[in-house]
Amino acid sequence: MAKTINIFIRPGLLLLVVFYSFALTAQPPAGYYNAAAGLEGEQLKTALYNIIKDHQVQSYDYLWTAFQTTDKQANGQVWDMYSNCGFTFVTNQCGNYSNECDCYNREHSFPKSWFNDVAPMNTDLFHLVPTDGKVNGMRSNYPFGTVASPTYTSGNGCKLGPCSYPGYTGIVFEPIDNYKGDFARNYFYMATRYENVIAGWYSNSTEADAVLQNNSFPVFESWFLNLLGEWHTNDPVSQKEIDRNNAMYAIQSNRNPFIDHPEYVYQVWGVGPAPVLPEPENYPTSFSAHNIHLQWSDATGPTLPDGYLIRMSDESFGAITAPQDGTLYTGPTDFTVPYGSEELWITNLNPNTTYYFKLYGFTGSGTGINYKTDGEVPEVEQKTGM
């Protein structure tokens, strides 16, 4: 890793070794999240905790150096999510400040007073970011939230004031829309990485109590969890976050799972967008009717269906319309069959009538259902007896 060796005599050698280490460790190893496969809710969160815990702890002074890798804009300036000041690394480090753009410092986006400023949380780069000193000071240890009537607005549009989000009326700090998802995923990381201790943080300050419950799941008060879910949805993972996640993996040897897998937010907490699974790759074969006993062989391929929707008409194949993703069909001519059954009996039909059937595979459920409708849809017709 980039900091496994602490002392180098020759500066040129230090630069070479750090660069080489970063190149080797920027991406997670194959199978990094295997232990989380197939889990959801609290079990998934605990599996992720076991994957990302025991990170390499850095010193507080080293954060200044780390920011030069984790939070550098394309123009070489500090990537400050609280201002548009254009800080230069090292040269503009705080120090004292009186006004916005005086200097940048080390912002605990998850306020350090909430966990009593103790290690390893106080130097965990996944919630520490370089920000304008003045704006950081105005934010103080207030929770994130939405503000309709700000008492303070920063140069880039961050706001401080009474919370306008339902469920809380205290003072909050609202970052700009471009970074709300970044901060939400930072908080999901903190709730997961420190699930072994976070249950005791709610009593450390009034502000912490407004956001945290006294448990390790679901961790957050309902209003705040809903807020984070909305921010996560409306500001999806950006290339900035992906690059930062890779850079921090090279430094800390752990990752933010909710950047690598945004769907984990829904799978753990049930907020944010439901993951959209890929549609089944193939249709089932041998689809046929025997006295309105429908039979088929299940679809195969890398992505298997969760089930099938069979649509029926007594007019023609053309009268059967393709289903729409996200819609459930429960009418008298629609039949849902789970994957693996490979048959359906349909009874109480009119005698001496020809019925037409089409079969659509799907993945997911509810509003997240995704039907396969392209290509040649399996169809069959069958006439009932007298």
Segments (PLM) and residue ranges:
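Domain-level detector of nuclease and nuclease-like folds
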Residues: 96-105, 110-274
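N-terminal signal peptide c-region/cleavage motif recognized by signal peptidases
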Residues: 18-23
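Pro/Thr/Ser/Gly-rich low-complexity, intrinsically disordered linker/stalk tracts
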Residues: 272-307, 351, 366-386
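Recognizes extended acidic, P/S/T-rich segments that occur
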Residues: 309-351, 364-375
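N-terminal module-boundary/linker segments of secreted carbohydrate-active enzymes
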Residues: 24-87, 268
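Bacterial N-terminal signal peptides that target proteins for export
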Residues: 2-13
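Hydrophobic beta-strand segments within extracellular beta-sandwich modules
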Residues: 357-358
